[in-house]
UniProtKB/Swiss-Prot annotation, chain A:
<feature type="glycosylation site" description="N-linked (GlcNAc...) asparagine">
    <location>
        <position position="271"/>
    </location>
</feature>
<dbReference type="Pfam" id="PF05450">
    <property type="entry name" value="Nicastrin"/>
</dbReference>
<feature type="transmembrane region" description="Helical">
    <location>
        <begin position="679"/>
        <end position="699"/>
    </location>
</feature>
<dbReference type="GO" id="GO:0070765">
    <property type="term" value="C:gamma-secretase complex"/>
</dbReference>
<feature type="topological domain" description="Extracellular">
    <location>
        <begin position="17"/>
        <end position="678"/>
    </location>
</feature>
<feature type="glycosylation site" description="N-linked (GlcNAc...) asparagine">
    <location>
        <position position="627"/>
    </location>
</feature>
<dbReference type="GO" id="GO:0018991">
    <property type="term" value="P:egg-laying behavior"/>
</dbReference>
<keyword id="KW-0732">Signal</keyword>
<dbReference type="InterPro" id="IPR041084">
    <property type="entry name" value="Ncstrn_small"/>
</dbReference>
From Swiss-Prot, chain B:
<keyword id="KW-0333">Golgi apparatus</keyword>
<comment type="function">
    <text>Essential subunit of the gamma-secretase complex, an endoprotease complex that catalyzes the intramembrane cleavage of integral membrane proteins such as Notch (glp-1 or lin-12). It may represent a stabilizing cofactor for the presenilin homodimer that promotes the formation of a stable complex.</text>
</comment>
<dbReference type="GO" id="GO:0007219">
    <property type="term" value="P:Notch signaling pathway"/>
</dbReference>
<dbReference type="GO" id="GO:0048598">
    <property type="term" value="P:embryonic morphogenesis"/>
</dbReference>
<keyword id="KW-0812">Transmembrane</keyword>
<keyword id="KW-0914">Notch signaling pathway</keyword>
<dbReference type="Pfam" id="PF10251">
    <property type="entry name" value="PEN-2"/>
</dbReference>
<dbReference type="GO" id="GO:0000139">
    <property type="term" value="C:Golgi membrane"/>
</dbReference>
<keyword id="KW-0256">Endoplasmic reticulum</keyword>
């Protein structure tokens, strides 16, 4: 018995961790760099590790022809190997003609994606690489839910979409990891070159370079299942010793949305007077996604449009008194909304519409405080949205309206469109106007508000007509190499659109249009373009570094905090909302009334201890000088959760009027590279191990207890002491 | 307990008690009763006491089989629907599996 106990203790005492660094070359993979599971109400998508797809031999797919090897499972190169493969694959080879091979391959464990370094230009038509669907947000379309159209009737993204439903709506059997670090990529490539690269005669032999990777999701099924399982009353026997609450399996995709009110209307002190104003909401979306959701800069999908709105906001901010005066007279106001999660069935705008209907937008009201007056859906006259700015074919833009609503209020809408046309023309761009009552609005935030109110009008300004011209909307490849001409053209477009926004907004509010149209700051547009688009990271340029003023900290080791990403995600794990918030404060904030405030502490006290909660006070540097000041602004940075998956709105649970996108909680492990030996080698090693173990048992077995007991009395006895 | 040292009267009494306890929705007790008294019931010469033991053992066997069928049917039924992630199956689940429905 004791012998067995000794054996068990010896075996249990062995820790193999100490050898792992000699067996594996480990590459750290941060959050967001790998494919994980996402859900909507009915399906699960993305990747999940299992026994079948963790390990594999590393191979390369460098060009189109290499996909032939995927069909034959590289048998001609590795005839003695019967396991699976991890394929090194540049992102630009994910195309319409290759995606089905990747999906159906039975010999792939996964793919290691990397940027090829091949430059793609904004006007490049050879790469149809939109990771979005042919009909983006088809399930949340106003016309579908209003039963005016069939599902995906207008295939607006058919030129660019790689698959009909988009790459984010694929339940992959394989795993995916994105390697952005060139050192890590070199290590993998070197491992491949040393061991796996076939010789000149096409042969190869053991040992091979293998790779293992594991990303384990907690949730499965669909949003409905994982949302329910996260509730405390989901189970009859809820026993969680740690916290007492149900463990989180998945979470609703949510992040900050930014709403800026240049001319805010305060709530009345007693809340008895309901003020009815009219609003034009100028909006641009702030999110994008890719096949691996987080890997998405969204240059054209997001950033150029945001710059044009920011430039318009800045122009407005510099002459706010005129706008304030006009708004007071006309009772019409303009506000800016940057919605997050719009590419995933309108998370931000859906939540905003819900809050408007319930009198909670933009702020929750406390009767003892003064807030920004709640905006109701019926107070929204126009939603002026801009999309995909900077990639127009020629110098032509399109305005998209809902035909039926347009006919109802044609005169006023024509006036808005006319001002947009004037703004564009001032920069030598043309506008194609709506054609008639049959017009439909492309995917836009308007759809959320159209469901809430029958009169809200859409004015969508974009460089496409019936179909998207840009073929990389929502894609890992929405990241361009801008030549000087392309950059200049994009900046001109942004300037023109910004002017058009200003012109339309000015006319709506009642400001003399000619006073503001010439005020768009092209230099600012150029600076922000270079900072947000050309630079490698948000804070790489001087302007943004000064705006940051040491305030930005990489709080998480996630892709979104260390790389440019506009993905919404499940937590505030991306830097972009912070970047945009600071830029909006810069655009619309003012220190005229706070010149005597000289410290961050006194600035924050201004906002905290006042009954007047309409304004926020931010201690922020001027991006030109770097000097801090206390900026007063009516800007609301607000986390918006889709009501369908928000525990605060149980009455709307899984209501498909709203987005039901959720993300799984997951555990991500590092990539391990190791040498794979032939099976016969492993059998030999097992045999040696067994023989060694047996010999050890016999060696220990011959010992008795006395073998290990040193008789301490013996030397003493020899010295004459009694035993 | 070594029941071989008990008298037949005490064995009948014990077998009866186990049968009655098993009747309180405790099929495992019936199974124990079956194994425990099977040899007395069926492998030894019959007498009045052993006839009674046989009666209880047969009843325990029938009850055990009934429970096995019921529990197996429930398990198959429950697992079939549990894998679909239905509300009622989730409600009755003790631990949710991670990474799968």
């Amino acid at each position: 018995m004791k012998k067995w106990l000794v054996i068990v203790l010896i075996i249990a005492g062995i820790r193999c961790d100490g050898f792992s660094d000699q067996v594996f070359r480990t590459l750290f993979i941060g959050e967001g760099n790998a494919c994980y599971r996402t859900f909507n109400k009915t399906h699960e998508f993305g990747c999940q590790a299992n026994r079948e797809n963790e390990n594999g031999l590393i191979v390369r797919i460098d060009k189109q022809e290499d996909f032939k090897n995927l069909d034959s499972c590289w048998n001609s190169f590795y005839p003695k190997y019967s396991g699976k493969y991890w394929a090194l694959l540049p992102v630009n080879l994910i195309r319409r003609d290759t995606i089905s091979q990747l999906k159906s391959s039975k010999c792939l464990s996964g793919i290691v994606l990397y940027n090829s370094g091949e430059s793609i230009h904004p006007g490049d038509e050879s790469t149809a690489a939109s990771h979005d669907a042919e009909c983006p947000n088809a399930a949340s379309d106003y016309y579908l839910q209003d039963k005016n159209e069939e599902y995906c009737e207008r295939k607006i993204n058919s030129r660019g979409a790689i698959t009909r439903d988009g790459l984010m709506k694929i339940d992959w059997r394989i795993q995916m990891v994105f390697i952005d670090n060139s050192t890590d990529l070199e290590i993998i490539e070197k491992c491949y070159s040393m061991f796996n690269k076939p010789k000149e005669d096409g042969s190869s032999g053991y040992p091979y370079c293998g790779m293992s990777f594991r990303l384990a999701n907690m949730a499965a099924g669909n949003s409905e299942i994982c949302y329910r399982r996260g509730k405390n009353d989901a189970k009859l026997f809820q026993m969680n010793i740690d916290s007492g609450d149900a463990p989180q399996l998945c979470g609703a995709m949510h992040s900050d949305n930014i709403f800026a009110f240049p001319t805010p209307i305060p709530t009345s002190p007693t809340n008895e007077t309901i003020i009815t104003s009219k609003y034009m909401m100028v909006t641009a979306r702030m999110d994008s996604f890719g096949m691996i959701p987080e890997i998405s800069v969204g240059e054209v999908s997001v950033l150029t449009s945001i710059i044009s709105v920011l430039a318009a906001a800045r122009s407005m901010g510099t002459q706010i008194e005129k706008w304030q005066k006009a708004s007071n007279t006309s009772n019409r106001n303009v506000f800016f909304a940057f919605f997050n999660g719009e590419s995933l069935d309108y998370i931000g705008s859906g939540a905003a519409a819900y809050q408007m209907e319930n009198g909670k937008f933009p702020q929750m009201i406390r009767s003892d405080r003064t807030h920004i007056h709640p905006i109701r859906p019926n107070e929204l006259d126009y939603i002026l949205e801009v999309q995909q700015i900077g990639v127009a074919k020629g110098r032509k833009y399109y305005v998209h309206v809902d035909g039926e609503r347009y006919q109802q209020n044609k005169t006023q809408t024509d006036r808005v469109i006319d001002r947009i046309e004037r703004g564009l023309r001032s920069h030598a761009f043309d506008l194609e106007k709506p054609s008639g009552s049959g017009d439909r609005v492309p995917p836009a935030s308007w759809h959320s508000f159209a469901k809430a109110d029958a009169h809200v009008q859409s004015v969508l300004l974009a460089p496409y007509g019936k179909e998207y011209e840009y073929q990389r909307v929502n894609s890992i490849l929405d990241k361009n190499e801008w030549t000087e001409d392309e950059r200049e053209k994009a900046i001109q477009e942004i300037e023109a659109v910004s002017t058009a926004i200003l012109a339309a907004a000015a006319d709506y509010v009642g400001v003399e249009t000619d006073e503001v149209v010439a005020k768009v700051d092209k230099k600012l547009i150029t600076t922000i373009f270079d900072c947000l688009i050309t630079s490698n990271f948000w804070f790489d340029c001087d302007f943004m570094q000064k705006l940051d003023g040491g305030r930005y900290h990489k709080l998480f080791n996630s892709y979104g905090f260390n790389q440019k990403s506009t993905y919404i995600s499940m937590e505030s794990h991306t830097a972009f909302p912070t970047v945009l918030h600071w830029l909006t404060i810069f655009a619309l904030g003012s220190d005229k009334e706070t010149l005597n405030v000289k410290s961050e502490k006194s600035c924050s006290h201004l906002g905290q201890f006042q009954a007047f909660q309409m304004y926020t006070y931010t201690w922020q540097p001027n991006p030109y000088t770097g000097n801090f000041s206390c900026l007063k602004s009516a800007i609301v940075k607000k986390v918006m959760v889709s009501p369908a998956v928000d525990s605060q709105t149980p009455e709307e649970e899984m209501n498909t009027r709203y987005s039901t996108w959720m993300e799984s909680v997951y555990i991500i492990e590092s990539v391990n590279l190791y040498l794979m030996e032939d099976a016969s080698f492993e059998y030999t090693m097992i045999l040696i191990a067994v023989i060694s173990a047996l010999l050890s048992i016999f060696a220990v077995g011959r010992c008795s207890e006395t073998t290990f007991i040193v008789d301490e009395g013996e030397p003493a006895a020899e010295g004459g002491e009694p035993l | 307990m070594d029941i071989s040292k008990l008298t037949d009267v005490k064995k009948v009494d014990l077998c009866k008690k186990y049968f009655l306890i098993g009747a309180c929705f405790l099929p495992l007790v019936w199974i124990v009763n079956t194994f425990w008294f099977f040899s007395d019931a069926f492998c030894k010469p019959i007498n009045a006491h052993r006839r009674q033991i046989r009666k209880y053992v047969i009843a325990s066997i029938v009850g055990s089989i009934f429970w096995i069928i019921v529990l197996s049917a429930w398990e198959i039924f429950f697992q079939h629907y549990r894998a679909q992630g239905l509300v009622w199956t989730d409600f009755l689940t003790f631990v949710f599996p991670t990474g799968r429905v």
